Every structure is written in structure tokens, then in C-alpha cells.
Amino acid sequence: MANTAQARKRARQAVKQNAHNSSQRSTLRTAVKAVRKAIEAGDKAAAAQVFLASVSTIDRIADKKIIHKNKAARHKSRLAAALKALA
């Protein structure tokens, strides 16, 4: 239990930050799923377009340190490899 005013405020802020970060991670997962779905459909043009949008999302979330930069790089690398294999 938070005893000081500062600790109580930090606890309130942590709840808000956790909700925001969870939302951002959900957005990341949705973007990755969209690329996977486009690749499975076999439409290379659509998959490439969705891939570019997802890379932007991944980079933005990594820049905010919601996920680690290496995890972002791993996501982008695996999606790019899957897209390349579609050709």
C-alpha cells in the first residue's frame, strides 16, 4: 500500500500507463496479424502495403519503449522474410 502522497500518485499514474501500453501492444499484435493474413491470402501487393503500415506501427511502439527495439527488429525481419517467400 502506498503510504506517501507521491507513492499514491505514482500508483494512479501506473494504472493509466499500463492501460495505454496494453492498448499499444494490442495495436502491434493486430498489425502483425494483418500482415500474416494478407500473406496467407497470397496477394503480394496487398501484403506489401499492409507490411509497410505495420512496420511504421512497430517502429513507433519501439520508439516509445513499449517494446524493446530488438523485439521490433525481430518482428519486422520475420514479416519481411515471410513476404519475400511469397514471391
From Swiss-Prot:
| GO terms for MF | small ribosomal subunit rRNA binding; structural constituent of ribosome
Q: Do the record's keywords include rRNA-binding?
A: yes
Q: Where is this region: Disordered?
A: 1-29
Q: Where is the composition biased (Polar residues)?
A: 20-29
Q: Coiled-coil stretches, from where to where?
A: none
Q: Which UniProt keywords apply?
A: Ribonucleoprotein, Ribosomal protein, RNA-binding, rRNA-binding
**GO annotations of cellular component type:** cytosol; small ribosomal subunit
Q: Which residues cross the membrane?
A: none
Q: What's a Pfam family this protein contains?
A: Ribosomal_S20p
Could you say which residues form the signal peptide? none
Can you cite a GO biological process for this protein? translation
Q: Which domain of life is it from?
A: Bacteria
User: What protein family does this chain belong to?
Assistant: Belongs to the bacterial ribosomal protein bS20 family.
Per the entry, what this protein does is: Binds directly to 16S ribosomal RNA.
Q: What is this protein called?
A: Small ribosomal subunit protein bS20
Organism of derivation: Janthinobacterium sp. (strain Marseille)
**Gene this chain is encoded by:** rpsT
